[in-house]
Amino acid sequence: MAATLTPEQITEYKGIFEMFDEEGNGLVKTDDLESLMSLVGINPTKRDLANMAKDVDKDKKGTFNCDGFLALMGIYHEKSKNQDEELRAAFKVFDKEHKGYIEWDTLKYVLMNAGEPLNEQEAELMMKEADKDGDGTIDYEEFVAMMTGESFKLTQ
C-alpha cells in the first residue's frame, strides 16, 4: 500500500518514524501513534486512532514497524484522494456554470431541501461560517472546509 506514496513522502515518513524509534530497534510504541500522526499533520478521532493502532499492531505487542506505518500512511493518502474526488464531483454539481464558486442562493436551497434539511437560520449560519472571504459565494476551498469541518488546501 505504500506504493501510493511518493518517494519524498516515504523519506519524510521514515524520518518521522525514526524520531519516535527511541530504542533504535525499528519499532515505535503504539501509544505514540497519536503523536506521530499529529506530527505529520493528521489528527484522527479517538475511534480512528484505535482502528489505526489495530491495523499497525497486528500481533498486539504494543509496537509497530516502519512498514506498517508506511502502509497506514498509504491508506490515509488513498482515502484523502478519494474524498477529494468525491468533494470535487459534489462541487461540480452545484457549480453548473463552472464559475469556480457556488452562488449563495443555490447552496442555501440545497442545505434547506436535501439530505437532513436545515432551517433557514441554520443554513445561513453555516454559509456565513463557510464564506471565509465574505464575498457572498462559496469557492472550492470554502466548500471543502464546510463539508469536512476543517480547512483544506488544494493539493495540486
Swiss-Prot record:
Disulfide bonds: none annotated. GO terms for cellular component: cytoplasm; myosin II complex. It comes from the Eukaryota. Ca(2+) binds at residues 131, 133, 135, 137, 142. Residues 8-43, 44-79, 82-117, 118-153 form the EF-hand domain. InterPro entries: CALM/Myosin/TropC-like, EF-hand-dom_pair, EF_Hand_1_Ca_BS, EF_hand_dom. It is found in: Cytoplasm. Signal peptide: none annotated. CDD domains: EFh (cd00051). One of its GO terms (molecular function) is calcium ion binding. Keywords: Calcium, Cytoplasm, Metal-binding, Repeat. Its main location: cytoplasm. Expressed by the venom gland. May be involved in the cellular control mechanism of the secretion of toxins from the gland into the venom. Belongs to the calmodulin family. Calglandulin subfamily. This is Calglandulin. It comes from Bothrops insularis.
